[in-house]
Amino acid sequence: MSSEFVISMAEKAVYVTLMISGPLLAIALLVGLIVSIFQATTQIQEQTLAFIPKIVAVLLALIFFGPWMLSTILSFTTELFSNLNRFAG
């Protein structure tokens, strides 16, 4: 097992991780921005107001993107374990 191979597998693992976490982080960022703009325009200074919409939005996004996220991580894991003898040898 060469160092280039290990680096490419680590790169693919990081890519899959970013691809899976990206939609949830983007939804949380967008909802947080909308709530912050709402708080700035109405001059509400409640710090806990931003958490509930973010949690609800991320849970809804998890329900929506969950099957895709699961299939993506499952295909990566299946590829990793099916080629394990090539990796170790």
Curated annotation (Swiss-Prot):
Matches recorded under InterPro entries: Bac_export_3, FliQ
Record membrane topology: Multi-pass membrane protein
Keyword Transmembrane helix: yes
Keywords: Bacterial flagellum, Cell membrane, Membrane, Transmembrane, Transmembrane helix
Localization: Cell membrane; Bacterial flagellum basal body
GO BP terms, alphabetized: bacterial-type flagellum assembly; bacterial-type flagellum-dependent swarming motility; protein secretion
Coiled coil: none
Membership in a protein family: Belongs to the FliQ/MopD/SpaQ family.
Listed name of the protein: Flagellar biosynthetic protein FliQ
Source organism of this protein record: Bacillus subtilis (strain 168)
